[in-house]
Each structure stands twice: as structure tokens, then as C-alpha cells.
């Protein structure tokens, strides 16, 4: 299963035609197993300004499984990830990224993103990161 991060979904919903957006479209068309987390769901929806677009976006997102943060251990793991990054001189700008990473690690899923925070986290934690296939730009 591939968890698609907010950074990729935003490009998708805006029709940005970035490499990530276009690749997500291909993954959807191919019927790949995609998901998101409850925090990603919230991040995407909070950025939608218009009511009609909010509802369309919400309905689209609800087509995919939503992994939920239910275990206190996930929050503790996120704190440990943040502390490890800081100790190694890596800046993680958003705690929410540590939470998403901790849940992806706990659920043993791959994260498709375009956020430098996750690259930093993957350097110190066993976060599986989805990479665009070679030749995709």
C-alpha cells in the first residue's frame, strides 16, 4: 500500500501537472493500492476554500482507506523521530510529518511525498519512501 502525502494530493487537486501529480494519476488509473492518514485528510481539507470544492475533495479522499492514529505508541514514536532528527542536526519543520511517518512505519506502508521533512526522517528512521520511477520528471 502507498500512502499519498498532502504535498502530492494538493498538486493532484490543483491540476498542477507536476511529476508527482502526473504519476499519482497513473497510479490511480492502474488501480494501485493507495491510502492516506487521518492527518493528511485533515491537512488537505483545511486548505480548501470553497464549500463545493471541499465536498468534492472530501468525497474523492473517502474513496481511499484512511489510516488512523489510535495508539499512544505512535505519538511516542513520532516524538522519538523528531528528537533523533534534531540530535543529528536535521530540521523537521512540522511535528505532523513525524506523526505521519510514525504511522507509516507502524503500518509498514510506503509514503509517496514531495516534502523535505520526510527525506530527513527517512535518514534516521525506517520510513519507506516511494520514489518516482527513473525517467519521470
Where are these regions (language model features)?
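A general structural signal for well-ordered alpha-helical segments in protein cores
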Residues: 21, 41, 54, 75-78, ...
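Generic structural signal for small/hydrophobic residues in well-ordered secondary structure
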Residues: 5-6, 44, 78, 104
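A generic structural signal for short hydrophobic patches within well-formed alpha-helices
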Residues: 9-10, 41-44, 118
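Short, well-structured N-terminal submotif of metal-dependent ribonuclease cores
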Residues: 1-36, 46-59, 136-137
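Acidic, PIN/NYN-like endoribonuclease modules and their adjacent C-terminal/linker elements
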Residues: 1, 101, 105-137
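Conserved glycosyltransferase catalytic-site signature
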Residues: 6, 38, 96-98
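Active-site neighborhoods of divalent-metal-dependent phosphate/nucleic-acid chemistry enzymes
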Residues: 66-112
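Short beta-strand scaffold positions
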Residues: 4, 36, 69, 112-113
